[in-house]
Amino acid sequence: DLPHPQQARSQRRLACEQAWQNSGLPIQILRLPGIYGPYRSVLQSINTRRSKMIDKPGQVFSRVHVDDIAGATLHLIQCAAAGKWPVVVNVTDDLPAASKDLLTYGAKLLGRSLPPLEPFAIAAKQMSPMALSFWQENRRVSNQLLCQELGYSLIHPDYHSGLRDCYLVEGFKALQTNPL
């Protein structure tokens, strides 16, 4: 699918991609959605009690674990050496999800409670312009080209696997003896 960004920041990003494509240089654009990994996940905000459970029905975001960014990059280098060189590749996991779903799963891993669910209309009043723009678009992207056509096998196919990895790497075992 061709992107149809609504936000100015997303439109600038697409214009930058198009400029690179028109440069005549041998390029490959890796589109990365929400990036997370050890020491950069919802586990920190839950553990420090800074998380907000925002409810915006129908709102989902695609994400990717840093292990899969590295793995997909290496895989695409091998594909290029074999003559497969798509110009634009989405690097994302298989399960776009609402932010509240990640927080709920992260809280289960940590054995922590979460704040009450807050409707987006209320939460938006306290958001920065950058945060607000992030929530204005659905950010669901497909990894079909990467996984089905180019044969990359995800290390973390969904946020469950990715957050379990973060949990183990970050040493949260001390907080709960039976992680999910």
What are these regions (language model features)?
Residues 104, 124-153:
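Conserved C-terminal active-site "lid" loop/helix of NAD(P)H-dependent oxidoreductases
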Residues 157-180:
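Amphipathic terminal alpha-helices
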Residues 61-64, 97, 141, 157:
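Residue-level signal for the nucleotide or nucleotide-sugar donor/cofactor binding architecture
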Residues 70-72, 76-131, 176-180:
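Mid/C-terminal beta-alpha module of Rossmann-like enzyme folds, strongest
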Residues 29, 35-45, 54-77:
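Substrate-positioning beta->alpha
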Residues 15-39:
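Conserved beta-loop-beta element that borders a ligand/cofactor-binding pocket
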Residues 1-11:
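Active-site "gating" loop of Rossmann-like NAD(P)-dependent oxidoreductase/epimerase domains
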Residues 46-56, 111-116:
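A short C-terminal helix-loop "cap" of Rossmann-like NAD(P)-dependent dehydrogenase/epimerase domains
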